[in-house]
C-alpha cells in the first residue's frame, strides 16, 4: 500500500539539505546516505548518491526515470548465489 497523496512524498531533511547544498555549489561529488526510505526528487537528477545496503555504500547515479522511486530500490541488500547444483558424486 502506497503513501497517502495528501501527505506527499517523503525524503529525509538531512539528505535534502545535502543535495540543495551541492546544487547551489554546482559540484557533483558523491553524497553518502543511510536513508534508503527517501523518495527520489527531481533535484537529485545528475547526482551520485551512495546508498547503504547494510554492508557498504552502493553508488547510485540518479536519472530522470528514477524520480518517484525510493533510493533503497537501487541498492539491493541480499545477494543470491544460486541453489546447490547436482552433485552426482555424493549420491553414490
UniProtKB/Swiss-Prot annotation:
Pfam families, per database record: Ribosomal_S19
UniProt-listed SUPFAM superfamilies: Ribosomal protein S19 (SSF54570)
Entry superkingdom: Bacteria
InterPro entries listed in its UniProt record: Ribosomal_uS19, Ribosomal_uS19_bac-type, Ribosomal_uS19_CS, Ribosomal_uS19_SF
Keywords, alphabetical: Ribonucleoprotein, Ribosomal protein, RNA-binding, rRNA-binding
Keyword flag Zinc: no
GO molecular function terms attached to this record: rRNA binding; structural constituent of ribosome
A biological-process GO annotation: ribosomal small subunit assembly
GO CC terms of this entry: cytoplasm; small ribosomal subunit
Gene3D superfamilies given in the database record: 30s Ribosomal Protein S19, Chain A
Record-stated family: Belongs to the universal ribosomal protein uS19 family.
Record-linked PANTHER family: RIBOSOMAL PROTEIN S19P FAMILY MEMBER, SMALL RIBOSOMAL SUBUNIT PROTEIN US19M
Function summary: Protein S19 forms a complex with S13 that binds strongly to the 16S ribosomal RNA.
NCBIfam families: rpsS_bact (TIGR01050)
The protein's name: Small ribosomal subunit protein uS19
Organism expressing this protein natively: Exiguobacterium sibiricum (strain DSM 17290 / CCUG 55495 / CIP 109462 / JCM 13490 / 255-15)
This protein's encoding gene: rpsS
Amino acid at each position: 500500500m502506497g503513501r497517502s497523496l495528501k501527505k506527499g512524498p517523503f525524503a529525509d531533511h538531512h539528505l535534502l539539505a545535502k543535495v540543495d547544498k551541492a546544487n547551489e555549489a554546482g559540484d557533483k561529488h558523491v553524497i553518502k546516505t543511510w536513508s534508503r526510505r527517501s523518495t527520489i526528487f527531481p533535484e537529485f537528477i545528475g547526482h551520485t548518491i551512495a546508498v547503504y545496503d547494510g554492508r557498504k555504500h552502493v553508488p547510485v547515479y540518479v536519472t530522470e526515470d528514477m524520480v518517484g522511486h525510493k533510493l533503497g530500490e537501487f541498492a539491493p541488500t541480499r545477494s543470491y548465489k544460486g541453489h546447490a547444483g547436482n552433485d552426482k558424486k555424493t549420491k553414490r
